[in-house]
Amino acid sequence: RKGPFNIFGLEIDSEWRSEKKWQRIQSYLPNIKGMKIADIGCSNGYYSYKLLGLQPDLIVGMDKTALYVIQFLALKSYTKQIQELLVLPCSSEEFNFKKINFDLILSMGILYHSKNPSSHLNSLKHLVKKNGYIILETITSNMPTNIDVKKNQTYAGMKNIGTIFTKKNLNDLMLSSGFKNIEIVNDSFTDSNEQRSTKWMNGKSFKDFTLPNGNTLEGYPPVCRSIFVAQKR
């Protein structure tokens, strides 16, 4: 799903053009040299490898999907000399190794899948050190209110969607969850240039679940993703 990758000349054209999101977040990263970083919902590790080039001390990827963890490990098998990067088959809520206080946490594309968004934000707060940073990327609602997707319903074809917050409501929730210096640094609308079917992922993708006017098949406004940067109080 995430990529692209080039492995010994083999071009893996992933469903997501993940370098586009990387370009959006890169300029808002703190100086991460020497930092301990958690990449929540890391998938196959694409963003972890991008972060690795900025010389952190440690990156811990977490993902509950076994296939993504296996993909992560398959890629890492070609880079055995890299000891600063590892992946764990768990969520941020399940991670309980209290000896690590992370300097930076990335949670991208996770919050709207959470059954309990407050619990997810609290887990980030407990993992990051005081004054440490989080980068939270999530779909946001351009309607006057949150979008609450009911059980067995979909949003842009996606299942297991909970609440899609307005930017103001998410800002308020982050404040009440113990974060400060909250900034919305980027808004972008997903399109079929960034997410699409390829020979490596030949199932249905973004364009199959959206209308010509940009709305989703379910009638929601165009899919907007927002990037929040904040620090723990």
Over which residues does each language-model region extend?
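Short, glycine-/aromatic-enriched active-site segment of Class I SAM-dependent methyltransferases
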Residues: 139-161
